Curated annotation (Swiss-Prot):
This is U6 snRNA-associated Sm-like protein LSm6. Component of LSm protein complexes, which are involved in RNA processing and may function in a chaperone-like manner, facilitating the efficient association of RNA processing factors with their substrates. Component of the cytoplasmic LSM1-LSM7 complex, which is thought to be involved in mRNA degradation by activating the decapping step in the 5'-to-3' mRNA decay pathway. Component of the nuclear LSM2-LSM8 complex, which is involved in splicing of nuclear mRNAs. SUPFAM superfamilies: Sm-like ribonucleoproteins (SSF50182). It comes from the Eukaryota. InterPro entries: Lsm6/sSmF (IPR016487), LSM_dom_sf (IPR010920), Sm (IPR047575), Sm_dom_euk/arc (IPR001163). Component of the heptameric LSM1-LSM7 complex, which consists of lsm1, lsm2, lsm3, lsm4, lsm5, lsm6 and lsm7. Component of the heptameric LSM2-LSM8 complex, which consists of lsm2, lsm3, lsm4, lsm5, lsm6, lsm7 and lsm8. The LSm subunits form a seven-membered ring structure with a doughnut shape. GO terms for molecular function: RNA binding. Keywords: Cytoplasm, mRNA processing, mRNA splicing, Nucleus, Ribonucleoprotein, RNA-binding, rRNA processing, Spliceosome, tRNA processing. CDD domains: LSm6. It is found in: Cytoplasm; Nucleus. Signal peptide: none annotated. The gene is lsm6. One of its GO terms (cellular component) is spliceosomal complex. Belongs to the snRNP Sm proteins family. SmF/LSm6 subfamily.
Amino acid sequence: MENGASSEGRDPSAFLGEIIGAPVTVKLNSGVVYRGELQSVDGYMNIALERSEEFVDGKLRRSYGDAFIRGNNVLYISAQ
């Protein structure tokens, strides 16, 4: 499988720790997508991104220096 996921039951927190500093895509439950460099993620899936961009309906809406995303809004995180 892609992005470090496998059928052998890999720990998601280990995967997230490995991609700190890497470019990621974060999709929210609302369908909004953020792309940026993963700065941190906590046990509640709260996410901090650097050099982030917000995409709505596939179109760039806004660019941010830093973005903080509340974990209960996150549908998935994908390493780019």
